[in-house]
Amino acid sequence: MKLRVRQKASNIGQVEHTRKIIKGLGLRGPGSEVVVANTPSFRGMVKKVLHLVEVEEVADGATSSKA
């Protein structure tokens, strides 16, 4: 399984640590989405920014439709 992560809110006004996590996930702004591996490290990053992103599990063959 992989995780599809979509940014639903802007990171303007967020602390620097949160902005770095969003950048580390590969998200560029509201509406952008990426497919990442379902590993403990990515899960931890997503957990820290759950208020800014939407997450869903997808099959292994999925790719990102927007970057």
From Swiss-Prot:
Task: List the Gene Ontology MF annotations in alphabetical order.
Answer: structural constituent of ribosome
CDD domains with a match to the protein in the record: Ribosomal_L30 (cd01658)
Keywords, A to Z, come to: Ribonucleoprotein, Ribosomal protein
GO BP terms: namely: translation
Q: Which residues form a coiled coil?
A: none
Gene3D superfamilies cross-referenced by the UniProt entry: Ribosomal protein L30, ferredoxin-like fold domain
Say if the entry is tagged with keyword Zinc. Answer: no
Q: Does the keyword Cytoplasm apply?
A: no
Q: Which domain of life is it from?
A: Bacteria
Which Gene Ontology cellular component annotation is one that this UniProt entry carries?
large ribosomal subunit
**What family classification does the UniProt entry report for this protein?**
Belongs to the universal ribosomal protein uL30 family.
Q: Which NCBIfam families match?
A: rpmD_bact
Cite the record's note on assembly: Part of the 50S ribosomal subunit.
Protein name, entry field: Large ribosomal subunit protein uL30
Where does this protein come from, organism-wise? Sorangium cellulosum (strain So ce56)
